[in-house]
Curated annotation (Swiss-Prot):
Database matches in HAMAP family: RsxA_RnfA (MF_00459)
Primary localization: membrane
Key words of the record: Cell inner membrane, Cell membrane, Electron transport, Membrane, Translocase, Transmembrane, Transmembrane helix, Transport
Entry superkingdom: Bacteria
UniProt topology in membrane: Multi-pass membrane protein
EC number: 7.-.-.-
Compartment(s) where it occurs, according to its Swiss-Prot or TrEMBL record: Cell inner membrane
GO cellular component, one term: plasma membrane
Stated name of the protein: Ion-translocating oxidoreductase complex subunit A
Quaternary structure (record): The complex is composed of six subunits: RnfA, RnfB, RnfC, RnfD, RnfE and RnfG.
Task performed by this protein: Part of a membrane-bound complex that couples electron transfer with translocation of ions across the membrane.
Family per record: Belongs to the NqrDE/RnfAE family.
């Protein structure tokens, strides 16, 4: 049980996919303009990453390895992720049309989010079992969502702030992201793995 908790805390805070591994930067910068959109994208990405991590484990251990076609891993995982994203898109369209409109083009772009593929590949490369794969996917997605929501809240406040003209827009956003990364570095000594 402790091992699972350490894996979860490690992926959320210490080895954050956005701030440490630099995966998922496109939606991090693109969807963080409004807090409401960031929350929706975070929830959708959390669902997709967790489910894709579990499905990728099953694909790897029950199809790719037994058939001796592990060299098709990346292609197979992209296919799994595309199916999971389409399923998520259908669920969001039916359950929350407003969120579906807010997310717009970013929902199908979860398919190309390198963080989702990164979770699947890294989970397999680190030889996680099925439960660890799910926890790793959920932890990575929770960390992604946490950073995305915090960053969106900061960007909303920066719009009203008196920022010097050369630093407005993307410049102050990148500085803020760098400061967030430094803040998350403080968690590095929290767990010794």
């Amino acid at each position: 049980m402790t091992e699972y908790l350490l894996l979860l805390v490690g992926t959320v805070l210490i080895n954050n996919f956005v701030l440490v591994k630099f995966l998922g930067l496109c939606p991090f910068m693109g969807v963080s303009g409004k807090l409401e959109t960031a929350i929706g994208m975070g929830l959708a990405t959390t669902f997709v990453m967790t489910l894709a991590s579990a499905c990728s484990y099953l694909m790897e251990h029950y199809i790719l390895i037994p058939l001796n076609i592990a060299y098709l891993r990346t292609l197979a995982f992209i296919l799994v992720i595309a199916v999971v994203v389409q399923f998520t898109e259908m669920v969001i369209r039916k359950s929350s049309p407003t969120l579906y409109r807010l997310l717009g083009i970013f929902l199908p772009l979860i398919t190309t989010n390198c963080a989702v593929l990164g979770v699947a590949l890294l989970s397999i490369n680190e030889h996680h079992n099925f439960i660890q794969s799910i926890i790793y996917g959920f932890g990575a997605a929770t960390g992604f969502s946490l950073v995305l929501i915090l960053f969106a809240a900061m960007r909303e406040r920066l719009v009203a702030a008196d920022v010097p003209t050369p630093f407005r827009g993307v410049s102050i956003a990148m500085i803020t992201a760098g400061l967030m990364s430094l803040a998350f570095m403080g968690f590095t000594g929290l767990i010794k793995i």
